[in-house]
């Protein structure tokens, strides 16, 4: 899930207001379109809505001087649902993944951070799930909903670290075993994803160009992990992501 922002994260993020100002004249139309797409699901397919969100992310990247480089697309399963499990660096992570993934995605997000203007519209348009991190019963309900949708063919983003702070950068925190329950229940592929330098987009006072990286690693299929416990799956995925970060010189 997209985790809660740590109190340490107090850096003035100039790129965010700068990007908003450069797109201010577009915002009314964007918000109107997102609301219409959300309110008329019978009119717009999941892919059509997702393509529009990708268009918005493209605007954010062009006007915010951000570029996302993608590697390992050949590792993505060609058919059926799956769950992307990336390391978590900052507020731009989900946008980097949308920029790097052509097929429709949804996501699980911390409920407390999901109702900001524009963020809320994106979450609703993508059919995202809002998880209450302080309510285990509600969290289990969300996991079961995600598992059902993934089994039916949807693809989800779920951040197994559950959070980040300003100092985290390209380092890893412990992956939470419970994050993997949705994929296990759906018997779906688990796709480890490595994000590099995504934190730089909103954790800097400068507006210099930023290039983020998204690396899709080979997936773990159900046949490979069915005998493992969720803590073992978490350790395996974390180790693979950590190894790739080390190979890239950021571990």
What are these regions (language model features)?
Residues 2-9, 140-251:
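Non-catalytic C-terminal accessory region of glycerolipid acyltransferases
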Residues 40, 48-49, 78-136:
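Catalytic core of membrane glycerolipid acyltransferases/transacylases, capturing the structured
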Residues 63-71, 138-140, 196-198:
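Short gly/ser/thr-rich secondary-structure transition/capping motifs
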Residues 63-65, 102, 120-125, 185, ...:
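Short, well-ordered coil/turn elements that cap or connect secondary structure elements
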Residues 70, 129-133, 222:
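Short acidic-hydrophobic, aromatic-tinged amphipathic segments that line or gate anion-handling sites
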